[in-house]
Design a protein with these regions (language model features):
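Short, intrinsically disordered/low-complexity patches at protein termini
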Residues: 50-51, 79, 122, 140, ...
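Generic secondary-structure boundary signal with a strong preference for alpha-helix termini
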Residues: 23, 107-108, 124, 183, ...
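Residue-level signal for well-ordered alpha-helical segments
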Residues: 8, 33, 46, 65, ...
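Conserved functional hotspot residues or short segments at active or partner-binding sites
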Residues: 206-213, 217-410
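Residues in well-ordered beta-strands of folded domains
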Residues: 17, 32, 57, 116, ...
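Polar, glycine-rich mid-to-C-terminal structural blocks
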Residues: 153, 165, 172, 176-238, ...
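Cleft-lining beta-strand/loop regions that shape enzyme active-site pockets
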Residues: 1-187, 198, 382
């Protein structure tokens, strides 16, 4: 209901009464409606000690984003002719328009280069997509960052760069979405999505990870088994596999969800503390240099006192599962006392857990606080301070011998 009242034509305005969450003071704000446009390039900059790396973060493959990336890279190269290489960040990018994936590949490779093929049961669904234009720079060193949430068009770009040995892929294995879906119109304005084909990268491999053709007995879908995966070769003869997304050339550890951090986010405590912090700090340091102080973290821990948030550690979850099995198999009564002792030993202390996970909690607090002052661009800028994948990319691009070796050049 509130959304309906707030929405309207660009240029019109409305008034809203707001209450400060901390002082409870009320005020009336006048807001002018505007057409909101969200860029698929949330952060582009020259990074590194001497601004020698062109960093481009692409959040989604939207209309004309290929040209936007081309212009961004070109601008960074002109600003610093001594640029050592490009870092194309496709982490958390769910994909989008296939044509734009081809256009982005075309920035770094020649025209008439195969990027992706689609193959279906009917020949009408078989298509070949090639680059059509002139590259911006086909020799400039390139790294592509991916993670488990890089999917579809992101995987096509990363897979193409890997298959033709054009760039080094860094991060974690990608999602593995290699299915082409076609939308069919139905009655009553309804639509039906039908899987009609699969994507294949230049080496001939399919990146699809989930095997919908061999469901489990309960109907669930599992990943394609290793026995069904095939080997393929890149342009330089490196071995790559199908059936499981894109495996990076340099693997970095994935971040597992931390129970206490998840609990804090579920209750919006990190978000709320950032708002509280901003209400008492008119300004902060520049986004690139801002760090949460020890006293600020101590204040956050104190602020959490008495607040309701609960969670189970992985050890506690495993113990519960063990108890369930022991009860079913009639072993539990015999080990009940020992079980209780282990349970007591594993019981967690919230303050201790906060200190154990201090680094990640501070990271997330910084994200939220910086966003209050410098918005999403500031958040990305601050995150680059301790981004392990970006550091690895800069290291590779700074070492031509290692870069060439990773690509299988002889």
């Amino acid at each position: 209901e509130i959304g309906k009242l707030i929405k309207g034509s660009p240029g019109t305005s409305f008034k809203v009464k707001v209450r400060d969450a901390f002082t409870l003071a009320e005020s009336v704000k006048s807001i002018t409606r505007e057409e909101i446009s969200i860029s698929s390039l949330p952060y582009v900059d020259a990074i590194g000690p001497n601004k020698e790396f062109a960093y481009v973060r692409l959040s989604q493959f939207t209309d004309r984003c290929g040209n936007m990336v081309r212009v961004a890279v070109d601008s960074l190269l002109k600003a610093n002719p001594k640029t050592k290489g490009v870092i194309l960040d496709l982490r958390f990018n769910p994909g989008g328009l296939l044509d734009e994936a081809v256009n982005i590949c075309n920035i770094f490779i020649n025209g008439d280069q195969l990027v992706v093929t689609t193959k279906g049961k009917n020949e009408e669904w078989d298509k070949t997509y090639k680059t059509r234009g002139t590259p911006l720079d086909e020799k400039l060193p390139l790294t592509v960052l991916i993670n488990r949430r890089s999917a579809s068009a992101s995987e096509i770009v990363a897979g193409t760069m890997q298959d033709i040995d054009r760039g080094v892929v860094i991060g974690q294995r990608s999602f593995g979405k290699g299915l082409v879906q076609t939308t069919r119109e139905l009655a009553f304005n309804a639509k039906l999505k039908v899987t009609t084909a699969k994507y294949y990268t230049p080496s001939g491999r399919c990146i699809q990870a989930l095997d919908y053709t061999h469901r489990n007995e309960d109907g669930s879908v599992g990943e394609i088994s290793d026995s069904l995966k095939s080997k393929f070769k890149t342009k330089n003869g490196r071995i790559v596999m199908d059936g499981g997304g894109i495996e990076p050339d340099i693997k970095t550890p994935s971040k597992e969800a931390i129970k206490i951090v998840t609990a804090l986010n579920d209750k919006d405590y990190i978000f709320d503390y950032a708002t509280k912090y901003a209400s008492t700090h008119p300004t902060i340091a520049a986004a690139k240099t801002f760090t949460l102080s020890e006293s600020d973290f101590a204040d956050f821990v104190k602020w959490l006192e008495g607040k309701d948030y609960s969670y189970q550690t992985k050890a506690e979850e495993a113990l519960d599962k063990f108890k369930e099995v022991a009860v079913k198999e009639n072993y539990f009564e015999a080990i009940k006392n020992d079980f209780t002792q282990v349970q007591k030993s594993l019981s967690h202390d919230k303050t201790q857990d906060l200190m154990k996970n201090k680094k990640e909690i501070i990271r997330q607090l910084q994200d939220e606080i910086v966003t209050r002052y410098y918005f999403s661009r500031g958040r990305y800028e601050n995150q680059l301070q301790d981004d392990e994948e970006v550091k690895e990319a800069m290291s590779v691009l700074s070492n031509p011998t290692r870069y060439s070796s990773l690509l299988g050049n002889k």
